[in-house]
């Protein structure tokens, strides 16, 4: 089975809905985190096994801590490789972050955007690729504190690591938008103009939460939105939070469409939803919208992986 088209993250809350889907539906693949599923058993594992027989599987890590200082978690890597082998998955991605410092921090934290960090993360990625026996992809993360010691911007940092490690780039479109709004350092459209498009081989899209009453003002003002004039910003809520608990916002859909216009191939694209689940029909409609955008730009080559 090939990993291509539009997908939806597999969650235990959605298991019955996945299993009731008819053949040839809009959802073309699923994704799980090895930390959550490597040792899962019981009815949850039985249902997942059934879903994995129907859908190609992408594996997306949460806690390898590629930016951390502690040695890579070899047990986690072994579990990840075993999970991928069991379900014939050939795609793995991880976050550009760290989540340990003398203990597990239960969050994805940023590092300074420096040349030293580039070399550190790239070496750890090469180690992971050697262990798994495949090229992995690196995801841009949302972050809420910017280091004053950074010597490059976020997309320059991502590109430099991907080139140094010879890995793929996993674009999270919502994270690009959230960071652009929260920090005001890099217009999301400029990010997409500057990212190494030849390395982009996977995309996430998700919803975010707006932490300010000004959100209503934004919704009602057509001339206060991001536009294609690079560097133009709108009046915005004080803080956007990458929650994966809301429907995808229109501004993020616009950014995904712009990404498809920029990319030489249309990568597999997954909708993330982690809590606050709506009726499954609403999630399915969002996946259908991804598929429609992919079809709109189908003049470019469609990217796929054997999975």
Swiss-Prot record:
Domain of life: Bacteria
Stored SUPFAM superfamilies: Xylose isomerase-like
Gene3D superfamilies referenced in this protein's UniProt entry, alphabetically: Divalent-metal-dependent TIM barrel enzymes
Cross-referenced NCBIfam families: PRK05409.1 (NF003818)
PANTHER family: UPF0276 PROTEIN HI_1600 (PTHR42194:SF1)
Family: Belongs to the UPF0276 family.
Protein name from the UniProt record: UPF0276 protein CGSHiEE_05645
């Amino acid at each position: 089975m090939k990993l291509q088209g539009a997908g939806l993250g597999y969650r235990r809350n959605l298991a019955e809905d996945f299993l009731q889907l008819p053949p040839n539906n809009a959802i073309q693949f699923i994704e799980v985190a090895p930390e959550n599923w490597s040792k899962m058993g019981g009815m949850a594992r039985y249902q997942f096994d059934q879903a994995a027989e129907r859908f190609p599987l992408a594996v997306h890590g949460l806690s390898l801590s590629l930016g951390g200082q502690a040695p890579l978690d070899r047990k986690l890597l072994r579990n990840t490789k075993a999970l991928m082998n069991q379900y014939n998955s050939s795609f793995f991605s991880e976050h550009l972050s760290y989540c340990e410092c003398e203990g597990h921090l239960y969050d994805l934290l940023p590092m300074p955007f420096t040349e030293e960090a580039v070399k550190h993360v790239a070496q750890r990625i090469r180690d992971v690729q050697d262990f798994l026996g495949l090229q992995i992809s690196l995801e841009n993360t949302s972050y809420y504190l910017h280091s004053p010691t950074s010597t490059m911007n976020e997309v320059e940092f991502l590109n430099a690591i991907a080139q140094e490690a010879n890995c793929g780039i996993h674009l999270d479109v919502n994270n690009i938008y959230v960071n652009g709004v929260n920090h005001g350092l890099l217009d999301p459209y400029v990010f997409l103009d500057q990212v190494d498009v030849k390395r982009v081989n996977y995309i996430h899209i998700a919803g975010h939460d707006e932490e300010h009453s000004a959100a209503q003002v934004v919704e009602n003002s057509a001339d206060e939105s991001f536009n294609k004039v690079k560097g133009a910003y709108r009046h915005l809520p004080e803080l956007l939070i990458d929650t994966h608990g809301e429907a995808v916002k229109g501004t993020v859909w616009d950014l995904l469409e712009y990404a498809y216009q920029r990319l030489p191939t249309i990568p597999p694209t997954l909708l993330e939803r982690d809590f606050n689940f709506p009726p499954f029909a609403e999630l399915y409609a969002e996946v259908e919208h991804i598929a429609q955008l992919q079809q709109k730009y189908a003049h470019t080559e469609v990217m796929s992986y054997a999975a």
